[in-house]
From Swiss-Prot:
UniProt lineage: Bacteria, Bacillati, Cyanobacteriota, Cyanophyceae, Synechococcales
Assembly and binders: Heterotrimer of A, B and C subunits.
The entry's keywords: ATP-binding, Ligase, Nucleotide-binding, Protein biosynthesis
Similarity annotation: Belongs to the GatC family.
UniProt function note: Allows the formation of correctly charged Asn-tRNA(Asn) or Gln-tRNA(Gln) through the transamidation of misacylated Asp-tRNA(Asn) or Glu-tRNA(Gln) in organisms which lack either or both of asparaginyl-tRNA or glutaminyl-tRNA synthetases. The reaction takes place in the presence of glutamine and ATP through an activated phospho-Asp-tRNA(Asn) or phospho-Glu-tRNA(Gln).
Annotated gene: gatC
Source species: Prochlorococcus marinus (strain MIT 9515)
Keyword Glycoprotein: no
Top class in the EC scheme: ligase
Keyword hit for Kinase: no
Name of this protein: Aspartyl/glutamyl-tRNA(Asn/Gln) amidotransferase subunit C
Annotated catalysed reactions: L-glutamyl-tRNA(Gln) + L-glutamine + ATP + H2O = L-glutaminyl-tRNA(Gln) + L-glutamate + ADP + phosphate + H(+); L-aspartyl-tRNA(Asn) + L-glutamine + ATP + H2O = L-asparaginyl-tRNA(Asn) + L-glutamate + ADP + phosphate + 2 H(+)
A Pfam family recorded for this sequence: GatC
UniProt-listed NCBIfam families: gatC (TIGR00135)
Length: 97
């Protein structure tokens, strides 16, 4: 199996915005090699007669109908907020223009 180079680990770390020292780069290279070896083992499994699925168990949502309800004590809730403006919560800006 082809070994994963330090440069490849550095590139992946850069893309993931991770700062790794040389020891961590070596550790991650070994871990990635083990993961790829495991994937190679999985590729050998015959799945020809296995039906495609997206999950192991079926997921069913039990939903209720959306109903608009006025809350009579909205001022009481707004008073709990660190900051408010009229009838709205005031939150810090998180998106730069």
């Amino acid at each position: 199996m082809k070994r994963i180079s330090s440069d490849e680990v550095k590139k992946v770390a850069e893309l993931a915005r991770l700062e790794l020292n040389e020891n961590e780069i070596h550790q991650h290279a070994e871990q990635l090699e083990k993961i790829l070896e495991y994937i190679k083992q999985l590729e050998k499994i015959n799945t020809e007669n296995i039906a495609c699925t997206t999950r192991a168990i079926e997921v069913v949502n039990v939903l209720r109908k959306d109903e608009r309800r006025d809350y009579e004590n909205s001022d009481e809730l707004l008073d709990l907020a660190p900051s408010r403006e009229n009838k709205f919560f005031k939150v810090p800006k998180i998106i730069n223009e």
